[in-house]
């Protein structure tokens, strides 16, 4: 293992690393963040020529190419094409103009594209340094893993490289959903804590939270059958869970959601919304013909019409109580003493790359997210889920660094994949499931879809393979049809419906976030369809024959497709799915023009395969013994899900995340 010295840590050989990612990419928890060496000044003497710098953006390697005369910048090309289309990718022209006008890397950036802007600044800084003849740094990343070894090796950092020390009682790593909720609870209790986050802002809020017998249920007189719920969670996981961990969520989530309410409603006036009754369940008719499911009334969200986001309000909450987040500070490694207790971490500034020791007297909580943005981990830990995925709706910064850091310290990773796959990965005809090569994406691979989620894809319309054949009962939880497609050509499938799409969706009555298709009305569904049509992924035709052509069906496959639609109409007329047993209320006619068709695979939201924990939220080692001083929550925690995500329990993952965030703080602070 190579030691990283203060002067030499940036000069690690790049052969095993990904090009375009810098040593500053020891993400606070799992994202890559880039860095260059010397700071470049505004004015000065340059060596005429063209220079290129790269840095990691939110989801890709950003490239800046600058041309210099002996005294000025004469041309700038900014390539952010791999960033989020409507944000970072769209900001390239404005960032280019800012660099030209400033004549330096000291620019304002573009609002809403902070991470991309920061990457452009760092890449530009490298160009200026090269033009001035100053030392520049080869872009490398400390341990990335690779295509055969996703884990890699823990960095060995010289004491001399650590130039700052911070002492605290509780350290929270990651300012996402779990980390910010833990911080809010700790702030409310007046505890001594710090939060670090590798990005420059809090991370995206997942708005739907699952809580058992919370205030909404109490107001409606609803009482959960907790034993049945425990059994159902275990059934989803095929028994590959720790039921004591599940019970912590079941028994303590009511207190969690009450604390959420106290901040959202009482403090900031944002109304909480509880979903219950028929709205929370599939129609009873489903059980007459199909395997039935449990539909626990656990879902809470809040009024977002004002633009409120929970994580941003939690940041405001802790700031008002005198706390804050150490942004642009990333996890490098955990530290432990001779007794094996986790005593803190070594972190790294993503601004100037100096190392910081955080001593945590009472414990460390890792709340770092999963690994959906890391193709090395996805392909090696979940080859099946990867193979059926066509689009992504995850946070690109979730690259599994927190999981890897915990494992380097001796923690035990769940052995079963548990991806959160939604059947909404819309793509153009001819596109297969799985990664495609990408010069700008982390690891050189990306999923091909350009739309994060096509929500109508969850509706149980007719679905066929590339041969035009129906192959499954389409009335199922979100991930069932995408796994069924793993056995079909290209691992994708086509969805077909007619002009009555909204009327059919209302009758289908799907639940959870897929209910947006029916509850959003014509304006919502038309917006989703227009977006997909513009992207060349959804087709609208006056005849089924024309639709078949647009969808790419030819020869025998086209004949089979048209025959399959005719057969499906017969089954609708009979109100009896003789072929696959779909409940009658979820059959639909395909007779009224215009007709719509698209190709779908999975949209990957996150991964739930994480570090094994006990009912207190403590990380477990490879002997399943608690690791003193280390707690885990969120998507990087395990012991709860396996194989899939129970999407008919809306909000269960976020409920688990917030419950164990609160639990960990209680444990570390000695509050229970």
Regions found by a protein language model. Give the residues of each.
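A glycine-rich dinucleotide-binding beta-alpha-beta segment and adjacent secondary-structure elements
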Residues: 333, 558-644
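Active-site- and interface-proximal helix/loop "cap" or "latch" segments in soluble metabolic
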Residues: 41-143
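An anion/pyrophosphate-binding glycine-rich loop and adjacent beta-alpha core
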Residues: 403-405, 412-553
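Glycine-rich FAD pyrophosphate-binding loop
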Residues: 188-206
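N-terminal Rossmann-like FAD-binding beta1-loop-alpha1 element of flavoenzymes
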Residues: 170-194
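Conserved redox-cofactor binding core of oxidoreductases
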Residues: 206, 251-354, 375-376, 435-437, ...
